[in-house]
């Protein structure tokens, strides 16, 4: 059994981790930390886990995290990098759901997250946690910085158009002019109290935010450049807040080059993802819905070419708390410990 600890178990990604790991046949939950809720039974805070998780929240000092095989950080940015060095020294693997180990450039990290990175040597060895792209590296990793929710949808939506193994080295699209129009449910903002996510503010409302620049932008650009194998990437990324709890819907717009105008893109996507257990390339003309993946680790993609013109539209949906966060973390953990990738992640989406 894999002994698992969770640092920061009181937020939405934390409880989602608990839900998934409590059902995982190869996991023993050994510690869940919270400084503010230490001593409280987990099931008291989250009644949905009653009878499934018997642990109490503990302080990080009492949790004996060094005795775990792997520790998940479902914490604000900056926490994982402060504790990773000691855990790694004790042979504990680290999976961070925040951004501490995503951006490889420490200056970019400081610019977008407002803090200096205090362990660049660990950042250098960290693997970006997007299994469909970095599977082999994740298998050998000690530290994984999980891909963000928006970045997961955008990168998986565009990978078949950029990856040389799919394109044969041809530039099928103008990579310098990509548009991502992305929408998220309110759980993406976390569990903290904020005016913008209060029911009276978010319900019956729809708005864009961070149009000037969202902190996921450099992460997406970094990932797309790595997938393409070149730096000729330009992205306009505009996120929106929608009046729903879970879900991300990204509508991606790309312009085809002359080399890309005679390609069967439905077939291209189907071939690229044919062996991926969590990626569903839907039939031509489909319109995926966020509720079709709610509570599951699946991601659904549909390809459109309006009027047969030179614009390709890719629709992508995922559950931001599962494939966009905790489920992807479990998927990476499975790879790191040599388990089948789908172990503990076969939940069917909840509908309605």
UniProtKB/Swiss-Prot annotation:
It is found in: Cytoplasm. Its main location: cytoplasm. Keywords: Amino-acid biosynthesis, Arginine biosynthesis, Cytoplasm, NADP, Oxidoreductase. One of its GO terms (cellular component) is cytoplasm. Pathway: Amino-acid biosynthesis; L-arginine biosynthesis; N(2)-acetyl-L-ornithine from L-glutamate: step 3/4. GO terms for biological process: L-arginine biosynthetic process. PROSITE patterns: ARGC. It comes from the Bacteria. InterPro entries: AGPR_AS (IPR023013), AGPR_type-1 (IPR000706), NAD(P)-bd_dom_sf (IPR036291), NAGSA_dehydrogenase (IPR050085), Semialdehyde_DH_NAD-bd (IPR000534). GO terms for molecular function: N-acetyl-gamma-glutamyl-phosphate reductase activity; NAD binding; NADP+ binding. Pfam families: Semialdhyde_dh, Semialdhyde_dhC_1. The keyword Oxidoreductase applies. It is an enzyme of class 1 (oxidoreductase). PANTHER family: N-ACETYL-GAMMA-GLUTAMYL-PHOSPHATE REDUCTASE, CHLOROPLASTIC-RELATED (PTHR32338:SF10), N-ACETYL-GAMMA-GLUTAMYL-PHOSPHATE REDUCTASE, CHLOROPLASTIC-RELATED-RELATED (PTHR32338). Catalyzes the NADPH-dependent reduction of N-acetyl-5-glutamyl phosphate to yield N-acetyl-L-glutamate 5-semialdehyde. Belongs to the NAGSA dehydrogenase family. Type 1 subfamily. This is N-acetyl-gamma-glutamyl-phosphate reductase.
